[in-house]
Amino acid sequence: MAITAAQVKELRERTGSGMMECKKALVETGGDIETAIEWMRKQGLAKADKKAGRVAAEGIIVTAVSQDGRKAAMVEVNSETDFVAKNEDFRQFAEDVAHQALISNPATLEDLTSLPLGKGRESVDERRHALVAKIGENLNVRRFTLVEAENGCIGRYVHGDRIGVLVAVEGGEEALAKDLAMHIAASKPQAIAPKDIPVEILDKERAIQIAQAKDSGKPPEIIEKMVQGRLQKFLSEITLLGQPFVKDPDIKVEKLLKDAGANVYRFARFEVGEGIEKKVENFAEEVRSQAQGD
């Protein structure tokens, strides 16, 4: 029978094991989750399996960049505790994974975790599993991204190993690209320009603003103007071009780029543990404070 991605995901969540291990277990057991767990235990995966119930919400963000500075990879690798996130073996593993992503161009996370790491035949996921057994915590290669700048450069910024940004910039100086990466780390834009915001997000915000404006009791034509104004403000807050530049709030990023003769055509921002239920420190505010010299 064909093994689905949903089955692999469920088995990963229940065992904490890697994609390839879970897929193999499901193939061996005809796709039955419970039997697959038992099979994995029989294959000597029990030690790692015992770590599966713990949430790996700490970790680090690591980047790797090509020699010509026009291509970069960024990886988030999670651990259970901040203490392990500072472990040298853990860091080396994360750096090796980022380098492998950079040189191999994997299309998916499953592709990345099945790649060989270093000169040996051990895969990324096999190395991860060995580290779980050695360190004694659940570890997870959570996500990665690749960013290329064919006609420009890559700006990158990592704050305290917990926030990472890659931004592809055409025109301007490398210093500008780095400043933009720092800005994105602090200001968390959702897209470059208003046209890049998904329609469903705009529709949801519009509905919220209409509901709020109706409570004012004003005429429909006034309500429409109020809604449009609030939507414009919303878009300026969540798009890179509309945001005040973090190092000089008197100028917007759009004007900063125009004055420098530069364009941003892609960026990626990772923050450790995004979407994982845990206590979150406000590292974005810390970046903003540092950038503004507070």
UniProtKB/Swiss-Prot annotation:
Keywords: Cytoplasm, Elongation factor, Protein biosynthesis
UniProt name for this protein: Elongation factor Ts
The species this protein was found in: Nitrosococcus oceani (strain ATCC 19707 / BCRC 17464 / JCM 30415 / NCIMB 11848 / C-107)
CDD domains: UBA_EF-Ts
Pfam families: EF_TS
Localization, UniProt: Cytoplasm
InterPro entries, per the entry: EF-Ts_dimer_sf (IPR036402), Transl_elong_EFTs/EF1B (IPR001816), Transl_elong_EFTs/EF1B_dimer (IPR014039), Transl_elong_Ts_CS (IPR018101), UBA-like_sf (IPR009060)
Chain segments carrying region Involved in Mg(2+) ion dislocation from EF-Tu: 81-84
General function of this protein: Associates with the EF-Tu.GDP complex and induces the exchange of GDP to GTP. It remains bound to the aminoacyl-tRNA.EF-Tu.GTP complex up to the GTP hydrolysis stage on the ribosome.
Family to which this protein belongs: Belongs to the EF-Ts family.
Gene: tsf
